[in-house]
Amino acid sequence: MRHYRNNDSGVALIVVLMVMLILTTMMLGFYFVTTGEQKVAASDRDNTVAYYGAVGGLEKMSSDLAAFFVSHTSPTPSQIDALTGTTYVPSLPGVTFPAGGYTILYTTAGSGLYSTQGTIQGSGPLQGLQGIITPFTLTVTASGPNNTEVKMTRVVQEVAVPVFQYGIFSDSDLSFFAGPDFNFGGRVATNGNLFLAEDGGTLIINDRATAYQDVIRAQLSNGFVNGTSGRYNTTVDVLTTAGGCPGSVAACRALALTEGSVTGGPGSAVNPNWTTLSVTTYNGFIRNQKTGAKKLNLALALAGASPIALIQRAPVGEDPTSTTGSARFYNQASLRILLSDTQAAFTNLPGIDATKQPYPLAEAGSTGMSTTVQRTNSGGSYYLSPTGSCNPPIAKSPGWAADNDYMFKINTTLLGGYIKIEMQLNATPGTWQDVTKEILSLGISHDVQSGAAPCAANNAILHLEEAKPIPTEGAPNSFAVAGSGNLPNTTYFYVVTALGPWGESLGTEASKATGGSSKKITFNWPAYPLAGVTGYNIYRGTAAGGENRYVSVGVVTTYTDNTLTWPTAGTVPTSTLTTLAATTTATNFVPVNLYDPREGEVRDNTGPTTLTFMGVMNLVEIDVHNLQKWFAGTIGTSGPQALYNSGYIVYVSDRRGNNDGSNNETGEFGYEDTINPSVTLGAPNGVLDAPEDVDGDGVFRTYGAHPYYLNDNLVTDPAGLFDTSPLKGTIQGLTALNAATTRTLTALQGRKNPVVLFRRAVRLEDGTLGNLPPLAAATCTVGASGGFTVAAENPIYIEGDYNASVANGFNDAVGKCHVPSAVIGDAVTLLSNNYNDTSDMANPTTLGGRTASTTWYRTAIVGGKNLSFPQPTWGNLDSGTDGGVHNFLRYIENWGGQTLNYRGSLVSFYIARQATGIYKCCNVVYSPPSRGYNFDIDFQSIAKLPPGTPRFTDVNALSFQQAILPSQ
């Protein structure tokens, strides 16, 4: 048998070799797998570095762009390009940005950036509103280690939203706590706390509401706890679905007292249920910062200026094209009206027309003052021509000694200071042309007359003075009854009126019984106090108020009645043209003053019949209708050349009497000792209380309690009114701070004399439907558009119907249309159609003498308010608040039983610096109206916004993506 054992030799070696081969192969496989994974991991790591480098670069670019638009509203392409320069490119370890890898793409239109108007998309705080949209594409390519690259793009919008797209906005705390139902409409936003309460009726928030701080339901801003004694605890409805309140009750829900974002007032514990309430229950229709609300800022606010810079006069040296300068209405205006105590105050103001000097209103003793005022440092004179009763001269005081007519100063002008009026040219924006002479030559007084009739065409745009109020003739007196007459045994009632260039005065009734038949009655009356009397009318009747026949007599002061039947039928005048005078005598005119009890009375206490100096406000009155004519060129010559930018803007800054004691103008009242919460009657306490610090800087200012006037004081004043300081006067009693609010004057003194404190204001009149500029739009010309904005550094009063009318309400009429309108001032007060300066002065603390009538206003309003403070021991439950949204529009009349109809947008950017009188109701300052308030939905269209509407800015991200590069 053959054996094969030797044939098996070497098999083991083969097996070993095969195993070795397999193991080697496996090891090679493991090696390649391991090294491959390492390479993949390294590549992934490098790509991750590049990826996060690209993301970081994109976030840096987005942040820089957002920060840029915080302080720039109209950037140039070069400014955008600069944001991609080397100083902006981030420095990241292991990452570089190749050339062309850090860019912002945009579309140009001419020399600027292309923008569109439209609805804002995305999820930012301005989403859903109409705005100016400027699109950008942000692109970042980041190179990482080992030639890795990642490219990221983001599409964003820079959006600018006009503030009047909001129904109500406040930069500080915002309070709702009306008694009757209140449903204004439009979006609601505040950069502070949102206090929501209602006292009897229902408050409806029928659009989105946001508070950057907290939503507070538990108390008012003065700390009053809602629900105490059953007050301020009724329904606050907030919508839960678009189109909800009040259209669908099911789509809104009452926000309970316990459902604020905090459990109490500001700074209290967070409500643990708030996020669910805000985001889920109310579907985001009410938010605070915790649930997505953002702060809304004007560009100038985050550029370092306070929002009140909008209305402040530009300081010397400021660039009009800077962020702050371009936001000021001083620079935006078509027409600006500036008044100061000295010519030096105008020197070097930005953009000023230095070729013309300011016009003097207070040159005591100027040659020929009755017809002209000399300019102090130029070769010529300004003439207020034509000189006549329809175009009177500058008011001059006849003096206390001249006729004992309640005048303080002798032989000095009553207006004071200098005025400069300039027009910005439409052909070359930024260039200003002096038009002072042209404007003043149209007239400076209102309600003047020629002969016995009002002037047919009084074209005055500015009313700086008015005819001296016509006194009421005194009552008959010194009655004597004698026999041998023709009068029967009866009682006769008599009224005597004075005749003269003013027409016919009012009279005062008196009566006398004959005491028997066949009698005659002799009586006297006081001589009328004005010069120019041509005679008297004597009215007689047999019942009080029934004087129905009269006789006319000459310039005498006695009469004997011995006639059974008087020859002429007629009734006693019940009203007189109290501000009419047919005269060219400067002493027959007085300043335009009113009394504001909110400013003058520190507490809501009735009784005093005298005025306080703080409440007498001197007005620059603007006849809106005549201004419309001037812009259209139907009066004057220059108006059509004025800057037209979606309409016209008029700016006013009156700083006469504004002096901080170091000859500096501040634009602020400067008296911060008027609230004194711990003092029941409000007497100054000599310290700065928190709500008095309107600047928020902790500095106690009292210079506003002292008058600074520029005459030499060598004139005769009523005893004790002024001290003898040669350059500044201190009202006796104001020298001691504890007497500042007790110094008083009579109604006639307040009406006829210049203000002695810095109390200047603007009043708009004759602004009914169809009277606002531009003329073509207001008269309903087909295709015409444009609006009208008035901005002032001072408080503004609107008298009578404005951009609407009693006859038509908020509707337009044939040939009379509303225009987009805004009124922007330190504070805004609405005066009714029935308002009268004389009644106002005569009834400083008596509402019965200041009765309002139903009036209509259609305009956006921006104004200041006052700081809230803890509820004091005096006053009402809401004392210490700012009055709430329902009292943001100020009143100084008895509106009881009347309706105040308002349509517009309510905006508060700042704390008032001049109208510092606190909210108080309802004994002295006003009685509330029935409020017909609502948001003007026209403002939801950018084309229907007033010129110069301030805007919020934001950068809104729309999309984000990563591009796949070939190198990846």
Descriptions of predicted regions:
Residues 144-151, 502-508:
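Short, exposed coil/turn segments at beta-strand boundaries within extracellular/luminal domains
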Residues 470-580:
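Disordered, low-complexity "stalk" and linker segments at domain junctions of extracellular
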Residues 39-71, 190:
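Membrane-proximal N-terminal amphipathic helix
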Residues 70-135, 144, 162-165, 169-469, ...:
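C-terminal globular interaction/adhesion domains in large, modular proteins
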Residues 2-7, 14-53:
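Aliphatic-rich helix starts adjacent to a transmembrane/signal segment
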Residues 151-161:
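A short, surface-exposed beta-strand/turn
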